[in-house]
A protein has these predicted regions:
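N-terminal secretory signal peptides that target proteins for export/translocation
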Residues: 1-5
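N-terminal export leaders
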Residues: 6-11, 15
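N-terminal signal peptide c-region/cleavage motif recognized by signal peptidases
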Residues: 22-24
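Boundary of Sec targeting at the N-terminus
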Residues: 26-30
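Surface-exposed patches in mature extracellular/periplasmic domains of secreted proteins
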Residues: 49-61
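Surface-exposed, charged secondary-structure patches
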Residues: 66, 70-137
Length: 180
């Protein structure tokens, strides 16, 4: 039996074999990433992409979110749709107006990851959000507590708390009525 391989097919196989260890190393890095690294990666992605609260944008961030938080965020869109169907003649502002990941309607200009506290399968990472200031006064600041859990061997974001005003993303998403 005589097999014939083209240079192109041999080159393709060689490239795939060469990339295999890189893919494996990346997968290991993802599962062993620290809570701080996960939060840094999430907000770096978030700040460099569209921050609007939309189904598509939530799906783009799913790799960083716990199944619970992802489910609650997706459910929020269903709740909004149900409310709109039940009140077809009513004009309303959606409950989740703005960006739930920064707890703001006006997007911050930068962020800083701070102190991390790890306890078994849970972690808390402090994040400082910054808005560019006008004049000498400087900008606004907001302190967040990003709560993570270890799921499937990797750290994922499970809740976001605004330390300045006590806002709790998961509690807001679990509220009984769509609009107060």
């Amino acid at each position: 039996m005589h097999l014939h391989f083209s240079r192109r097919s041999i080159s393709t196989v060689a490239v795939m074999l060469a990339l295999l260890p890189i893919h494996s190393a990346f997968s290991q890095l993802q599962t062993s990433a620290t809570p701080e690294a996960v939060v840094q990666s999430f907000y770096r992605f978030h700040f460099s992409h569209n921050m609007d609260f939309s189904r598509q944008n939530v799906q783009r961030r799913r790799q960083w979110l716990s199944p619970q938080l992802l489910g609650l965020l997706i459910n929020e869109f269903h709740r909004e749709d149900e409310y709109a169907r039940a009140h077809p003649k009513e004009s309303f502002v959606p409950y989740m107006e703005g960006d739930p990941f920064t707890n703001s309607q006006e997007y911050p200009s930068s962020f800083r990851v701070g102190k991390t506290v790890v306890s078994d399968e849970k972690a808390n990472v402090s994040v400082l959000l910054l808005w560019k200031g006008r004049g000498k006064e400087g900008g606004d600041k907001r302190n967040l507590d990003i709560q993570l859990v270890r799921e499937g061997g990797k750290w994922v974001i499970n809740n976001i708390l605004n330390k300045d005003n006590g806002d709790d993303l998961v509690a807001n998403l679990k509220r009984e009525k769509y609009l107060p």
